[in-house]
Amino acid sequence: MGLLSVLTLVLTVPIWRRTPITGTGLSFAGLGQAGGLRLLALALLNSLPVAITSTLFLFFVEDRLQLPDKAGPLLILFFLSAGASVPLWAKLSNRIGPKQTLLIAMPLSIAGFIGAASLSAGNLAGFAVICLASGAALGADMVVLPAMFSVVLTRAGLNASAAFGIWSFARKLGLALAAFFTLPLLERSGFTPGQTNSAQALTTLNLAYAVLPCILKVGAFGMVLTLPTEVTRK
């Protein structure tokens, strides 16, 4: 995650050089009226798939795909794809709008989850392609959703610093929820990392890593579909 943070910082320097808008005091009522709470709910739901896969990535690669010592290179590939895609998604968002950009990016992630669920053990090339696609999709989440939230705050004249503190909390909550629900689920199935596991345990891992995030991502995609286009444009 540190590598991804550095890449994001470097690639989004022009965005953070803009003059900050402090706005007026922040309240949940004000956020709700501006549409900010809706975007916060979307951010939380949309953070869950990547939070789950981040939590279970090592288990999936080494135990489900049986690719020991390949998790590190695959994770780097995922991060590089995410970081490299950020400026491309930013340009596309400026051209066609944030909502339409997300509607293009999210199916990439959904396709990646479907592909991961159907991979056979030892399929390194197939999972590498999935890491590239899902990393690129994450790049859109990193740049487009915060930009949409910023537009809402600016139009409503709300305090950006306080609001983005709540935004950051929502994403961290997603990570906590991912670990809270998936790790006990694997434990109950009898899954043990680095050991010979039963078919049931590996199926549970497959469902937790690929199928559940896919369902959550489809839900987030549905939420994006309901967003008014005019609200998401600068």
Task: Locate each region found by the language model.
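Loop-to-transmembrane helix entry
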Residues: 57, 63-81, 126, 200-208
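Helix-to-loop junctions at the C-terminal end of transmembrane segments
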Residues: 84-98
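Residue-level signature of mid-helix packing/kink "hotspots" within the transmembrane helices
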Residues: 79-87, 176
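Intracellular loop-helix junctions on the cytosolic face of multi-pass helical membrane proteins
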Residues: 1-58, 62-67, 205-234
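C-terminal ends and interior cores of transmembrane alpha-helices
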Residues: 107-122
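Cytoplasmic membrane-interface "Motif A"-like loop-to-helix N-cap segments
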Residues: 94-108, 156-157
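Loop-to-transmembrane helix entry/capping segments in MFS-fold secondary transporters
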Residues: 68-69, 155-170
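Hydrophobic core of transmembrane alpha-helices in multi-pass small-molecule transporters
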Residues: 125-142, 148
